[in-house]
Structures are given as C-alpha cells and as structure tokens.
Swiss-Prot record:
One Gene Ontology biological process: xyloglucan metabolic process
Span of the signal peptide: 1-23
Family as reported in the entry's similarity comment: Belongs to the glycosyl hydrolase 16 family. XTH group 1 subfamily.
Protein name in UniProt: Xyloglucan endotransglucosylase protein 2
Keyword list, A-Z: Apoplast, Cell wall, Cell wall biogenesis/degradation, Disulfide bond, Fruit ripening, Glycoprotein, Glycosidase, Glycosyltransferase, Hydrolase, Secreted, Signal, Transferase
One example GO MF annotation: xyloglucan:xyloglucosyl transferase activity
Catalytic activity reported: breaks a beta-(1->4) bond in the backbone of a xyloglucan and transfers the xyloglucanyl segment on to O-4 of the non-reducing terminal glucose residue of an acceptor, which can be a xyloglucan or an oligosaccharide of xyloglucan
Source organism: Diospyros kaki
EC class: transferase
Chain ranges of the GH16 domain: 24-222
Post-translational modification: Contains at least one intrachain disulfide bond essential for its enzymatic activity.
Conditions for induction: In fruits, expression is greatly decreased by gibberellic acid (GA3) on day 12 of storage and by 1-methylcyclopropene (1-MCP) until day 12 of storage. Expression in fruits is also decreased by low (0 degrees Celsius) temperature treatment throughout the storage.
Amino acid sequence: MAMGTHFGGLWLALLCMVSATMGAVPRKPVDVPFGRNYVPTWAFDHIKYFNGGSQIQLSLDKYTGTGFQSKGSYLFGHFSMQIKMVPGDSAGTVTAFYLSSQNSEHDEIDFEFLGNRTGQPYILQTNVFTGGKGDREQRIFLWFDPTKEYHSYSVLWNLFLIIFFVDDVPIRVFKNSKDLGVRFPFDQPMKIYSSLWNADDWATRGGLEKTDWSKAPFVASYRSFHVDGCEASVNAKFCDTQGKRWWDQKEFQDLDSFQYRRLRWVRSKYTIYNYCTDRKRYPVMPPECKRDRDI
C-alpha cells in the first residue's frame, strides 16, 4: 500500500504541474479559530483546545465520543476543515464531517472516515441525502496516510452541483438533476457538523472488526475551520441570489476537463464501492449517475 500511495502522489503532482492553472478550484480557505463558527454539542470534556482555539482534538473512549456543530445554518457556499485522523488501530471508529438540515425529510452531505486495523488503510465514505433519501454511498481509499498530516476536506455547494474535495482534488460530484426526477438540496438550510464516535457494528469490514478499547482514547485533530456560505438561519430567501455569489459563477457550475481527469484518476485507482455500479442493489441505474459521470 505504501508503494501505491507513493506513486499516486507522484501522478497527482504531475497532473498539477501540467495543468495547474486550468482547474477552477474554490477560493482559498480562511484559517479561523474554532469558536468563530462552531460550538460543542455533546461530551464537552472530550474536546481539547490548543493555540487559542485554532486547533482542537476530539476524543473517543468506551464511554462516549464527542462532536460539534456550526452556529449558523447555510444555504450554499464553500465549507472546509483540515483533519488529522485517529492514528494506529482505529477499527470501529468513525470520524464524520457533514452538512445536514434539521427535519424528517432532511438533506445531508457526508464525509465519513472509517477506521481500520493498524497498517490497513482508512476508507472514506461519501453520501448525499435529498428529501430524507440517501443510499448513495461511494467509498474510496486515499492516496496518502490521513493520520500523518493534516489534509483539507471540503464541500462546494451551489444551485448546480455539490463537489466533494480532498486537498482540492474533486473526488465526487452530485449534480442538480431535478429535471430527471431526482431531488437536489436547494431550499433547506444546513448546519455543519463533525463528530468522532464508535460504530463498530458496521464501520470496519461490515462490523466484523470491533473497537479495541485498550487502545483508547482515540483522538482526531482539527484546524482551519473555514466557512464561506450564505447564512440562512434567519431568512432563507436572502440566499436565493440567482448567480450573485462567487460560488454561482460559471466556472463553478461544472468541473473543467482537468478536474474531470483528476476525478477519473480517483475513480480508476482508488474507488472501492460506487452505488451507481451496484447492479444487485440497483438493477436499474439511478438516473443521476450518468450525469454525474459516476460510471
């Protein structure tokens, strides 16, 4: 796995050198402290603060995990944070970063990092819920060890699409396919959440690998709590700007050719599960898959 990770990094670097100016990546995140945009939600004593709140650590033990959420709710924008995952034997643990509305027919945009035994790679699972319906899981390996250094995980969300980024590499696109009968998150403001919790009933090898509590506490580290979105906590209609925000501009309404090459690189080398190609689960391919170039 180490050799594959090394060559994966070299290939990505070559792509960047060849076409470094072509990709319309989101604006550079602004490094702000935790307390500017976020508050703890549970198990406050399992969150530690460093450097005036510019860095935090979440801790999981056999009694509880912990988590936090944004102060505001947002309708469209760019949201990111840098995370260093639980090192060592992290089997059974899940570190989650996601956006979600607060109702029964909720919308949700998920990053879930599934821990593994020492020496085995993390799995990144993404999912999109619209109108309370999810079941759009995709899983990838990463081309680096996410426990060694901080890496950026971000979401760009506008009226046209949702893009999941890992260090500015697009790993998934979910386009607005309302014309195909697929609901899209466009009118329910979402809060931003993150949590570290035990999910050993499903997270690692379908629940076969259980959390080894002798390795606790499990610690995930965070920094760079970037939020650049339309805060809709008071008036959602204010955010229906019809193209006036930077994230609505033409260059952010689709990936360009360079970004699609990077997405195909992730698809071909690191994807281990894609609901779009699961014919046992979906004998008829979901209508959004072809538009999202997930096949």
